[in-house]
Swiss-Prot record:
Protein name: Prolycopene isomerase, chloroplastic
Record's subcellular location: Plastid, Chloroplast membrane
Source organism per UniProt: Solanum lycopersicum (Tomato)
Membrane topology: Peripheral membrane protein
Entries under InterPro entries matching the protein: Amino_oxidase, CrtISO, CrtISO-like, FAD/NAD-bd_sf
Length: 615
């Protein structure tokens, strides 16, 4: 739900994002809505069909004047809705003239593709849907522009080495305006514990200590250890950890920082917290902090991952892109096109083509085939090795991965448009709600994450309205085997319960203020995001040894690479963006666009493979 933050070379910083000043209690960015997509579309919007009305849930929604709109279609009329900067009619390519084919246009896939294109590679991205972004995409309905996934955006700062989104955009000559969020998240927890994560670190520590004054020393020591890790990463130029020339170069430049990270690589946040903290309520709070990073508690969350989020929210801060999260993918897609590569939409890859054990191409559902020197899968590892490749030929390395990690649950998502006056003045943008019992933290529907992006950018909704995006963990098994009628009825029942909890805890009168509502289930995520069981990503079966067991980008299949949330370092927009940078660097070295040593490569990959067996 939340995101991790890593680094990209610092030389690309200048001019890549513009910060919009905060207002007072009103929405912090007001902009006249345009009838077309501004400069990110190739061609004139007046000559193109507008992408609007995208819907990835089926629900009975209240009309904006209180009436009822039935059966909002989940299927887009793709002939009318395809973005003009994408293509859908590229012929199959038998020659293998592409340097790389990327399956999927999620953020990880787009970053890998754009980084390769910048290095001079010819890249083709194949996207099943009609817009880019995957979980970081968007859809529009009745004047509302909804983020598909999380609205908590790291990586947009203008300082340090961990502003990966800023620099990924800059690499292809793109920039986005952003709005700083003064509060990362407002926790509403058992025993009336209310904690705001302020942008300023000292303000956050002061508030947390005021709730647990007897744990002041432990609080400072735990978060100081997080900063030790963060500062080590912030000093490094992170690229592919599978590329030895780069890796050894960084070690010789920054040996202390590299050794610090190596020390914490197999450790988890919960075990570190317990060195300094005894209060069970405070430890449970740290569990909640980690849960929004990894969907598991602190004892199962790698310390490096936790440190990135718990510190970068104060260092670089949370910054929301003007126009919504979908602007990130749109900008990267435009940048890819500007650099001579392309995205093919409505391109449903059904299999990876092997030739003597080497990945050489892909086949689409319509029969077209495309060939390239390398194949990069932005699908989950379960989809890649269970569907795009034959599961019975699962490599040993993937067997080991699936023994150590399971598919995390999916989510129930509720997108709503509400009357603005239901929200109190100075309402925070992001909320985490767990009312009564800490043991419900990881249970289905136990905790609720809420984003109200119109608190920051009012242009996302009609005047006088707000957007609420609610999500809570849910397993696909809860939604299988239902008739269409029972499926719709269950969505209404579950959504009603979730909304009632928010009405009781945060916003009295919420139900009566609803003007639009649409519900998505794990089946929705599976269908539109092409994710096995709609999963959020991998989570450890037991207590992991930090990040030691997470696979990198190379695979046991020659010519096949993976990128995204089932690769190191894991889930979250910045994490998958970093995965994309790592993947592009490794692929570029293998294609001859970067320096490479075959002898060192072989030795390092064997070492990394052995280390993963220790997890």
């Amino acid at each position: 739900m939340c995101t991790l933050s890593f680094m990209y070379p610092n030389s690309l910083l200048d001019g890549t994002c513009k910060t919009v000043a905060l207002g007072d209690s009103k929405p912090r960015y007001n902009k006249q809505r345009s009838s077309c997509f501004d400069p990110l579309i190739i061609g004139n919007c007046t000559d193109q069909q507008q992408l609007c009305g995208l819907s990835w849930g089926v629900d009975k929604a209240k009309g904006r004047r209180g009436g009822t709109v039935s059966n909002l279609k989940a299927v887009v009329d793709v002939d009318k809705r395809v973005e003009s900067y994408g293509s859908s009619d590229v012929e199959g390519n038998e020659s293998g003239s592409y340097d790389a084919i990327v399956i999927g246009s999620g953020i990880g896939g787009l970053v890998a593709a754009t980084q390769l294109a910048v290095k001079g590679a010819k890249v083709l991205v194949l996207e099943k849907y009609v817009i880019p972004g995957g979980s970081s995409g968007f859809y529009e309905r009745d004047g509302y522009k909804f983020d598909v996934g999380s609205s908590v955006m790291f990586g947009f700062s203008d300082k340090g080495n961990l502003n990966l989104i800023t620099q990924a955009l800059a690499a292809v000559g793109r920039k986005l305006e952003v709005i700083p969020d003064p509060t990362t998240v407002h926790f509403h927890l058992p025993n009336d514990l209310s904690v705001r994560i302020h942008r300023e670190y000292d303000d956050f520590i002061e508030e947390l200590v005021s709730k647990f004054p007897h744990e002041k020393e432990g609080i400072i020591k735990f978060y100081s250890e997080c900063w030790k890790i963060f500062n080590s990463l912030n000093s490094l130029e992170l690229k592919s950890l599978e590329e030895p020339i780069y890796l050894f170069g960084q070690f010789f430049k920054k040996p202390l920082e590299c050794l610090t990270l190596a020390y914490y690589l197999p450790q988890n946040a919960g075990s570190i917290a317990r060195k300094y903290i005894r209060d069970p309520g405070l430890l449970s709070f740290i569990d909640a902090e980690c849960f929004i990073v990894s969907t598991v508690n602190a004892l199962q969350t790698p310390m490096i991952n936790a440190s990135m989020v718990l510190c970068d929210r104060h260092f670089g801060g949370i910054n929301y892109p003007v126009g919504g999260v979908g602007e990130i993918a749109k900008s990267l897609a435009k940048g890819l096109d500007d650099h001579g590569s392309q995205i093919l939409y409505r391109a449903n890859v059904t299999s990876i083509i092997l030739d003597n054990g080497k990945a050489v191409g892909v086949k689409l559902s319509d029969g077209r085939k495309f060939y390239a020197k390398t194949i990069v899968s932005n699908a989950t590892r379960w989809d890649t090795f269970g569907k795009l490749l034959k599961a019975e030929n699962l490599p040993k390395e993937e067997e080991n991965f699936q023994k150590a990690y399971v598919k995390a649950p999916s989510f129930l998502s509720i997108h709503m448009g509400v009357k603005a006056d239901v929200l109190p003045p100075d309402t925070d943008c992001h909320h985490f709600v767990l009312e009564d019992d800490w043991t419900n933290l990881e249970k289905p529907y136990g905790s609720i994450f809420l984003s109200i992006p119109t608190v920051l950018d009012s242009s996302l909704a009609p005047e006088g309205h707000h957007i609420l995006h609610i999500f809570t963990t849910s397993s696909i098994e809860d939604w299988e085997g239902l008739s269409p009628k029972d499926y719709e009825a269950k969505k209404e029942v579950v959504a009603e319960r979730i909304i009632s909890r928010l009405e009781k805890t945060l916003f009295p009168g919420l139900k009566s203020s609803i003007l639009f509502k649409e519900v998505g289930t794990p089946k929705t995520h599976r269908r539109y995001l092409a994710r096995d069981s709609g999963t959020y990503g991998p989570m450890p079966r037991g207590t992991p040894k930090g990040l030691l067991g997470m696979p990198f980008n190379t695979t046991a299949i020659d010519g096949l690479y993976c990128v995204g949330d089932s690769c190191f370092p894991g889930q979250g927009v910045i994490a998958v963006a970093f995965s994309g940078v790592m993947c592009a660097h490794r692929v570029a070295a293998d294609l001859g666009f970067e320096k490479k040593s075959d002898v060192l490569d072989s030795a390092l990959l064997r070492l990394l493979g052995w280390l993963r067996t220790l997890a």
